[in-house]
């Protein structure tokens, strides 16, 4: 299904609290943008969810399964798929080989079959077809035999989305997906995210600084500031929030108290996993 929930998720580094008891529930069929000023704790929150960092306190659940004590790779197998700000690819392999490896990682039982030449050939042919199907979806078949190192930055990010698709996650996590892209490259990635969003069985989380991208893609926005969840709601409502303006601009409008009601009911939900 892709129901992701964090409960009182916290990260402390010495005396610094990078993420402070953040509780959120993310539902399938929605794209949630996680925004906030630099140092707000957005990427740290992502790291806690995906298992790149251990939580000091709190829990992470996906479809009722607790992920808190699992490694990053185990969380990937459970259904969390994360793209990084820096591409995480094999530069000396071809585009097709990269995707085929990702497809192979999701295949269950292939490695348990007898090691005869026929089964090896069948597995290879099947994986290749699946990888080619994914490359067709992201319009990269013409680059299938190119090495990753030869691709421009925008195409490498595009390939990273293809790798995520190969893993068949129920939750997609994008951390600054258009970072470092030109004005011509960024729309390609955004179109891929739109395609993923059209699948109402998937849950999408997006960390993004570009507010025009957030306004266009997000069904919901949560705002972190100094590691705390300060606003959670629909884009228009959150954008107009005095709490959000204070977090970004450092100015405390008179209306800030009235805006505190923007914190989502999700954060205060009494529903247990």
State the predicted function of each range.
Residues 1-273:
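Glycine-rich phosphate-binding loops of nucleotide-dependent enzymes
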């Amino acid at each position: 299904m892709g129901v992701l929930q964090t409960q009182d998720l916290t990260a402390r580094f010495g005396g610094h609290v990078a993420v402070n008891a953040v509780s959120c529930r993310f539902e399938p069929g929605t794209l949630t943008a996680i925004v906030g000023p630099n140092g707000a704790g957005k990427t740290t929150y992502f790291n806690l969810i995906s298992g790149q960092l251990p939580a000091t306190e709190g829990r992470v659940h996906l479809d009722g399964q607790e992920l808190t004590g699992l490694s990053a790779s185990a969380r990937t197998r459970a259904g969390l798929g994360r793209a990084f700000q820096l591409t995480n690819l094999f530069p000396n392999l071809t585009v097709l080989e990269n995707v085929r490896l990702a497809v192979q990682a999701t295949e269950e039982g292939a490695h348990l079959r007898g090691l005869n030449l026929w089964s090896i050939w069948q597995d290879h042919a099947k994986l290749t077809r699946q990888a080619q199907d994914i490359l067709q979806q992201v319009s990269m078949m013409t680059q299938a035999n190119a090495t990753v190192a030869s691709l421009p930055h925008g195409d490498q990010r595009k390939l990273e989305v293809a790798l995520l698709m190969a893993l068949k996650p129920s939750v997609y996590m994008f951390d600054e997906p258009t970072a470092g892209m030109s004005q011509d490259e960024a729309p390609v990635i955004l179109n891929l995210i739109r395609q993923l969003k059209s699948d109402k069985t998937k849950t999408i989380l997006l960390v993004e600084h570009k507010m025009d991208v957030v306004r266009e893609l997000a069904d919901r926005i949560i705002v972190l500031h100094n590691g705390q969840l300060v606003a959670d709601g629909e884009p228009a409502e959150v954008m107009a929030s005095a709490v959000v303006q204070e977090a970004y601009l450092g100015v405390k409008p008179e209306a800030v108290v009235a805006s505190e009601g923007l914190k989502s009911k999700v954060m205060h939900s009494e529903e247990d996993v």
